[in-house]
């Protein structure tokens, strides 16, 4: 398949630049992967769609304020977007400046040069930096960092984003983009779902900025997927096995939960074992033709045209059903992307 097969026209005004006043106030488009039928509703309908015995799998990563502004030794301005923390002092980052800083030079971080970091080496599009401070990278980011809103939101971050570009159940710092399907859940809705007899499990996938990188090849088979760190602990494996045994459904909240679970499934298939915990980097690329191993339903936002995520959804619901649902969403003025509306998708099984 070609990348252009996943194109759709999206009017600029349908890109959500701010969240709704309440988390659960978004709209929800239901899609049946077998029939292609769509149904319009509101996100609170999730309470009716989830059944007793189902398992919802959330990504509990926490978005870090990963964007810093500063300058080079020469005085030129730069912007640093942390992609991954290697340890408490070393990190990989995207660096934007008129000229790339050279290895061995210092960069000054913060509006008043509060901190400095040494440029250690370049790794493809990323730079390795070493913080020269008696604080950890996380502590420095909490002090001078900005929330790393996606490029299409196209505005400076605001104080409200510190809360709203974050799930209510976040636990483990490390993401530089939010697992956005989870943004629609508030504590009240979570309690109501639990009261129905559904169970919850938590994976961790630290979403990288690579999630916004465009696919630069025409043939999707030639695309090299970015790497992200994921954790699927033993308790998630146990919860999935118990859910399958009782006839419940595994409902992934977000594409990052899907990629975590399916990474664990693929690793176990490769090793010829039953489902095992997974801790490590994943470059899993899911596109039409992929056979899902674990996930039965998917809650997800609307994704960018020609992105790897619309390909993942197409593999889940069927290509034609997915593209038709997206056309329906555009025609009915759903809000798109991170702060936009959501879908509830039942997997295509026939």
UniProtKB/Swiss-Prot annotation:
The keyword Secreted does not apply. Its main location: cytoplasm. It is found in: Cytoplasm. Keywords: Cytoplasm, Queuosine biosynthesis, S-adenosyl-L-methionine, Transferase. GO terms for biological process: queuosine biosynthetic process; tRNA wobble guanine modification. Pathway: tRNA modification; tRNA-queuosine biosynthesis. The keyword Transferase applies. One of its GO terms (molecular function) is S-adenosylmethionine:tRNA ribosyltransferase-isomerase activity. It catalyses: 7-aminomethyl-7-carbaguanosine(34) in tRNA + S-adenosyl-L-methionine = epoxyqueuosine(34) in tRNA + adenine + L-methionine + 2 H(+). It comes from the Bacteria. Its EC number is 2.4.99.17. GO terms for cellular component: cytoplasm. Pfam families: Queuosine_synth (PF02547). Transfers and isomerizes the ribose moiety from AdoMet to the 7-aminomethyl group of 7-deazaguanine (preQ1-tRNA) to give epoxyqueuosine (oQ-tRNA). Belongs to the QueA family. PANTHER family: S-ADENOSYLMETHIONINE:TRNA RIBOSYLTRANSFERASE-ISOMERASE. Monomer. This is S-adenosylmethionine:tRNA ribosyltransferase-isomerase.
